[in-house]
Amino acid sequence: MADKVQTTLLFLAVGEFSVGILGNAFIGLVNCMDWVKKRKIASIDLILTSLAISRICLLCVILLDCFILVLYPDVYATGKEMRIIDFFWTLTNHLSIWFATCLSIYYFFRIANFFHPLFLWMKWRIDRVISWILLGCVVLSVFISLPATENLNADFRFCVKAKRKTNLTWSCRVNKTQHASTKLFLNLATLLPFCVCLMSFFLLILSLRRHIRRMQLSATGCRDPSTEAHVRALKAVISFLLLFIAYYLSFLVATSSYFMPETELAVIFGESIALIYPSSHSFILILGNNKLRHASLKVIWKVMSILKGRKFQQHKQIGRETMLF
């Protein structure tokens, strides 16, 4: 029964992976083509491209981990190459979260309207320093990933190996104090960008409220470009927050799985849920970006035209064959 559930979850993971690769590859391809065409890249496009690349890598690592867990369980328990996979999973996980946080921060500084000198100073310089901020996210993610991977995943592999040898649920003896401290370190590391996004969300709401109040006092109405920009930014940030919460819970299931009776099943279940975040959020970003949305509509229109053309050719061929008979 457990094997059937694992196989079903694996097929689900493959479907989520395909959707995620399609959306993130589209974002990266459109922005790179625009970069080559204009020979420069806007800050928002740089953030979206970096986020798309990190999520493509994250999707590949998670799916590879699922395949090894289901198809090669011995390698999963004892293989030294799993340390490499664990490192890249932790790295791409933090890169994806921090790049999404940078996107929320960028929306906040570009759209929000405050008159504090510090805010105005940062607002004027956000485009100049965004590349350095992204580079800092890479360095910080590497710094977090190295010690966390070495401590947390060594205990996990030992537990899987012990359970396979003894076939007992609670026979795994791990250093729970070390596991708890490492897990706390990982959770705090992901909690910081979440708090930053949450702060950006509430400040955007405050900025929108002030803007609407000013528009009402001036009797010019509430629906203007600035209001619509606020609403689009809020939708993007809140979608990230909700998906991140689901991803965070699935991450907790995966990292805590060796305290559960069915370790492997808990891991692949957590990973299949975790794939929803990098897969679905890319399409939300496409719909919220004018350039990406227009490019996607062009692609859909071309695909529909090709399909209609093929269907017309098939009907035409059938008509010719009917006339011959």
UniProtKB/Swiss-Prot annotation:
Subcellular localization: Membrane
Residues exposed to the Cytoplasmic side: 31-55, 116-128, 209-235, 288-319
Annotated TM spans: 10-30, 56-76, 95-115, 129-149, 188-208, 236-256, 267-287
Predominant cellular place of this UniProt entry's protein: membrane
Residues that carry a glycan: 167, 175
GO molecular function: bitter taste receptor activity; G protein-coupled receptor activity
InterPro entries to which the protein is assigned, alphabetical: GPCR_Rhodpsn_7TM, TAS2R
Membrane topology, Extracellular segments: 1-9, 77-94, 150-187, 257-266
Keywords of the record: G-protein coupled receptor, Glycoprotein, Membrane, Receptor, Sensory transduction, Taste, Transducer, Transmembrane, Transmembrane helix
Topology relative to the membrane: Multi-pass membrane protein
Pfam families named in the record: TAS2R
One annotated Gene Ontology cellular component of this protein: plasma membrane
Note: Several bitter taste receptors are expressed in a single taste receptor cell.
Described function: Gustducin-coupled receptor implicated in the perception of bitter compounds in the oral cavity and the gastrointestinal tract. Signals through PLCB2 and the calcium-regulated cation channel TRPM5.
Family: Belongs to the G-protein coupled receptor T2R family.
Protein name stated in the entry: Taste receptor type 2 member 7
Annotated organism of origin: Pan paniscus (Pygmy chimpanzee)
